[in-house]
């Protein structure tokens, strides 16, 4: 299971986007989820908790950000500027 991918989660029928961490790429062995679903952990600011959401793969987009950077920014409620990473 790939659990180190930072993603943008798009909420259907809105312009809301969240940053989350893929915690489970496949839910096939869990019969109550559709096959295209993935598990994404969405941390809350100040690390008081977070939500694990099960969402269709089509609603997530991987981004070039480390888990450490995503968690740090979440902890600080995205108040600090992040360094832009350019593709080579």
Language-model region placement:
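Terminal membrane-proximal soluble interaction domains of membrane-associated proteins
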Residues: 2-88
């Amino acid at each position: 299971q790939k659990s180190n991918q930072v993603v943008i989660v798009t909420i259907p029928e809105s312009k809301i986007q969240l940053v989350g961490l893929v915690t489970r790429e496949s839910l096939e062995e869990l019969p109550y989820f559709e096959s295209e679903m993935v598990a994404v952990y969405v941390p809350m600011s100040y690390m008081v908790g977070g939500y694990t959401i099960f969402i269709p793969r089509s609603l997530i987009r991987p981004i070039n950000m480390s888990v450490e950077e995503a968690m740090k920014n979440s902890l600080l409620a995205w108040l600090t500027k992040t360094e832009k990473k350019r593709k080579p």
